[in-house]
Amino acid sequence: MAPKRKSGVSKCETKCTKACPRPAPVPKLLIKGGMEVLDLVTGPDSVTEIEAFLNPRMGQPPTPESLTEGGQYYGWSRGINLATSDTEDSPGNNTLPTWSMAKLQLPMLNEDLTCDTLQMWEAVSVKTEVVGSGSLLDVHGFNKPTDTVNTKGISTPVEGSQYHVFAVGGEPLDLQGLVTDARTKYKEEGVVTIKTITKKDMVNKDQVLNPISKAKLDKDGMYPVEIWHPDPAKNENTRYFGNYTGGTTTPPVLQFTNTLTTVLLDENGVGPLCKGEGLYLSCVDIMGWRVTRNYDVHHWRGLPRYFKITLRKRWVKNPYPMASLISSLFNNMLPQVQGQPMEGENTQVEEVRVYDGTEPVPGDPDMTRYVDRFGKTKTVFPGN
């Protein structure tokens, strides 16, 4: 007779005498861009792709278009003018490369703004690249020749310092002002400088990090790159990427492909939330400079950048209660006046009294009471 098989239960196995404790569930809260993030919206129409491009703003504006009246410099800066001394440095506005930016208006998602939850667009990923790098192969132009003695060889191609930055966000890019020399006299007409924002002349702190020298990139071609930089202390609702390569004869190095995707989600899996259905794109792409043959004048060269952004819908908690919206509506209906100061350092308010309920008549009409930071009522005893 064949031997019987023993039971499959191992003698070494120990059974749990009681159920293992489970961690208590707690609410999970994510805050992004000032919004309380809820769940994703599902459905076939929840994902949108947008393609756009930004042209460079190197100093020369898009107009005039005539190639004999300034249009030939579009995509370039005008000739860089040097300082005549340490205290006399006043660059022309058309020699300063500036930030390119644009706002894309997305389809409206919410018809009823009184609900507790709203839908918002969320930027998930972006494909981007600099367009036109092949144009830098032009070595037959009227630039400084490589053989300066016999005026032969080839035309010196674009080379020098390069700066590449792009940003995608649900709000304008936050900028921090910082300059090389606070004595530089930037012209305020046509560009936004630190003095434009602070209403004061630049100080030595503007050569490092001055907390008051901050701005938002709200205008295209107005914020010089050498003054304004992405603010790492802010930009919670924006993703920016960049690199800088310095040098006077550094050759441009560019990689381009339509297969590289940059994910815009943070460590919590949340991308920039587009407030007011607005998507903001920003970039700077400086390739270096060209040197003209006649006067050895240097001109910055910039190239355009292409964007392909993928967006999806998200449910968020309505951050604006109906009561505050109605209150804001009534407040905006009131006329704006400019009177004497009743707030701040120069306030002309003498005294404020607050009454609540009733009490027996106090024996001291000048009695002083106040509420401390713990919410307790205190009475000041009269001094001698």
Swiss-Prot record:
One of its GO terms (molecular function) is structural molecule activity. Keywords: Capsid protein, Caveolin-mediated endocytosis of virus by host, Disulfide bond, Host nucleus, Host-virus interaction, Late protein, Phosphoprotein, T=7 icosahedral capsid protein, Viral attachment to host cell, Viral penetration into host cytoplasm, Virion, Virus endocytosis by host, Virus entry into host cell. The keyword Phosphoprotein applies. A motif (Bipartite nuclear localization signal) lies at residues 4-18. The keyword Phosphoprotein applies. InterPro entries: Capsid_VP1_Polyomavir, dsDNA_vir_gr_I_capsid, Polyomavir_VP1_sf. The modification Phosphothreonine is found at T358. Residues 322-384 are annotated as: C-terminal arm. Homomultimer; disulfide-linked. The virus capsid is composed of 72 icosahedral units, each one composed of five disulfide-linked copies of VP1. Interacts with minor capsid proteins VP2 and VP3. Forms an icosahedral capsid with a T=7 symmetry and a 40 nm diameter. The capsid is composed of 72 pentamers linked to each other by disulfide bonds and associated with VP2 or VP3 proteins. Interacts with terminal alpha(2,3)-linked sialic acids on the cell surface to provide virion attachment to target cell. This attachment induces virion internalization predominantly through caveolin-mediated endocytosis. Once attached, the virion is internalized by caveolin-mediated endocytosis and traffics to the endoplasmic reticulum. A DNA-binding domain overlapping a bipartite nuclear localization signal is present in the N-terminal region of the protein and is required for efficient virus formation. The intrinsically disordered C-terminal arm interacts with neighboring pentamers. The unstructured nature of this region allows to make different interactions depending on the structural context: pentamers present at the 12 icosahedral fivefold axes bind five pentamers, whereas pentamers present at the 60 icosahedral six-fold axes interact with six pentamers. This is Capsid protein VP1.
